[in-house]
Structure formats: C-alpha cells, structure tokens
Amino acid sequence: MTLFVRRGRGSHPKPTRLLTGNSDSQRIMEFRNRMRDRGSPALFATQFLLLATLLLSGCSTLASRSNTGVVVSRSAQIRSSTAVVAADLLEVNRGDVIDILDSIDIPDPSDNSKRELWYRVRAHNDDRTEGWIEARNIMPDKVLENARKLAEEDKGTPAQATGQLHAGSNLRLTPDRSNNENIMMRLDSGSSFEIIGWKRVPKLKGSDSTESDTAPKAGSATAGANKGPQSDEDNPEEQETTELWYKVRLSPQNSPAPEGWIFGKQVELMVPSDIIYYRTGREFVAWRRIDDDSNDETSTKGKDVAKESRPGSWVILERSSSKEPHQLDEPDFDRIYVLGYEKHDQEHYTAYRSPDIEGYLPLRIEGRGSDKTFSIRIKDDSGKITDAKYSLYRDDRGVMRVAAPGEVKGKRRR
C-alpha cells in the first residue's frame, strides 16, 4: 500500500511515497498527476481569455452609453464638480464637440424645489479634459440629428421672410411649449434667422403672452403692470384661442441646429427698408425679391438685415389686420402685392395687386432675367388648395406687369 501527502493547496508537487506497495498503483497515480500538471496552463489560459472577454465586453457597454454633444452657448466652463465653488478647468465655445460620459440631477442652488441637469464630459483638446458642465450648454448629438432631419425635409423651401428675436427664447424641435422635452437650446435676444413657414396651434390654458421660461430683467416692470384691469373686449389677446409659431432656419453662427421652431410672440419680422413704407393697412407676412440678386437678400445677415436691402422689385404677401381671434385653419395671407422698380427714375410703382384670396405658403420664384414666374397655393371655390403660378413680363413701355393664372401675357419689350 502506498500513501501520498499533498504539501499545499494550489501547488502540485510530486507525491512523496511514505510506504511502498503495489508498483502498478504507483504508476497510475503518477500518470494522473502528470496529466493534471500539464492541464493547468491550458485551464489558466482559458480562464484568462474568459476574463479578458468579460472585461472588454464591459468596456464596450460603457462606451456605447456615452455619446457626443455640441456646445450651444457662446462660451461655457467645464468645471471640476457640480458645486458652486468648483474650479473652472476649461472654456469651451459654441460649436465645440465634446463626449458626454454621464449625467446627474442636482438641486438648483437658487431654488431647492427645482433641479438642474449636469453632464460629465470629456473635451477634445490635447489634454482630453474631463469635468462637469450644465446640460443647458450642450446639445446632445441625438437632438442635433433630429434638427438636421427637419432641415433636410425643408431644404427645397426658400426663405419666406426674415425675423429677429426681441427677447431670449427657446429653439424647439416641435411647436409645443407644454413641456421642456423638445427644447434644443436657448437663443439670445437679437438672434436673426430666415422664416420658412409658420403654424398656429391651440393656446395653452393659463399661458402668459410670452414664452413660459422667459424671465424679465431684474428690476424691470412687466408690460401692462401699471394698467388697470381690462375686459376681454379691450384686450384682444385674452380672446385668442391659438398661438403662432415660426419655423426658422438658422446660420451656424447662431445655432448648431440648422432648423427649429420659435414661439411667435418673441419674433419681430424684419421687413426690408426698401418696402416697409408701402404697407397700406395690411401686414407684410412674406416677401421675395424679383431681381436676379434675390439670393443675397434672403440670407440671414444679422441684426441689421432689414436695413441692408437695395431698391428693387418685390413680390409681397399681405394679410388683413383683424381684432377677431385667429383660427387654426386660417390662410397664411389674403392678398398679393407686386412692387416694381424703375431704375431710371429710382421710383417704385404698383405692378400688381390681387383681389382678396385665401393663400398659403410657400412663395417660390423661378426663372431668370425678365422671364420669371412666382407660385403660391390658393384655396378655390370648392375648398381645394391648388398651386397657382403667376407670370411676370414687361409691356411696351417697359413697365413690369403680372399675368394671373389663366390670363394671357401682354406684349413684352424686346
């Protein structure tokens, strides 16, 4: 009989024979030990590979949770923590791309009943600076992608007008301010943009006449605060059941998001100085130059966009002013006004003024030189909305004229 003693757990020394017995049993035991010793490296390698796979899988999961974002503020600080006394680590500017690693909600220091969202981020600088930044300064890539899809849908729609914010306002993905989930970023007062369309939606119950998250400057009085109580008849705003939203196209200098929606009460239409004095009791809601350099006039140029237009010929869409509440399905405009320009005399003249119509956007101008047309959409007597194309031409005296749909052009000047 042969007895074996194992020296230590986890080690595999050769067995020590204390008593000698059957030699066959000894050889069998030694063979089993050799096979066990040879199998250990293979087992260890298998376990190592399994562990490495799990670790890599974990890293991949963490990487998939992170995404990128774009800085929307003019400038912002990446900080060492979310604390008020945290150190500033790095300044980032509008358009900078950063990695979003994590997020956290913390109590608002100025109001504990509210919470602020912060992102843990990594900058794309040489040091790959990591820290914390307020979420309002960042537009996640998913939001930006949705804004780009919106712009792609409207890429063929020309600018209908230009506008400018007279107060800071939110740029939203949809025309809805019942919640904050669709807010893409905050636009500064004075931001300018192209207006490519608008829409009326039901008015929020109990909503103010301004954007819900627009606060007045400290120490300033609220508009109408010193006025006495007004009845619904004295204040038409109280009778409104709808609110107006503008779909706008923005330049990269103002927003990484190329398109979005802005609450109408924050927008001032920037009617070009060349035509502003030709309003005759109706609002100008859309305008396009007829001249060949019209593309220069429809681009967003900044705060003074309305002051930079040169004299020329225009197609203008007008809407009658009314004290009646607006309706959801009301037309965009009710009259077409074509303003010609005589270069020799440097004077404007009325080339065409349509009868009252129920017209809808968009306004499009096609052609070059004197051979041009413009098109809109009109509701006919049956209630159907159809395309309508108007032709521009010059008569024997060189005066611009307009042939409405179905009319024959007059003789052109050669």
Regions found by a protein language model. Name each.
Residues 56-58:
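C-terminal motif of bacterial Sec signal peptides marking the signal peptidase cleavage site
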Residues 66-88:
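Post-signal peptide N-terminal segment of mature Sec-exported envelope proteins
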Residues 1-41:
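N-terminal secretory signal peptides that target proteins for export/translocation
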Residues 336, 346-414:
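Hydrophilic extracytoplasmic domains
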Residues 312-329, 371-380:
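Short beta-strand elements that form the blades of beta-propeller/WD-repeat-like
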Residues 88-110, 179-240:
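Conserved beta-strand/loop element in small beta-rich adapter and peptidoglycan-binding domains
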Residues 61-66, 112-163, 210, 214-305, ...:
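Boundary regions of SH3-family modules and the immediately adjacent low-complexity/disordered segments
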Residues 82-87, 173-181:
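Short alpha-helix capping/helix-loop boundary micro-motifs
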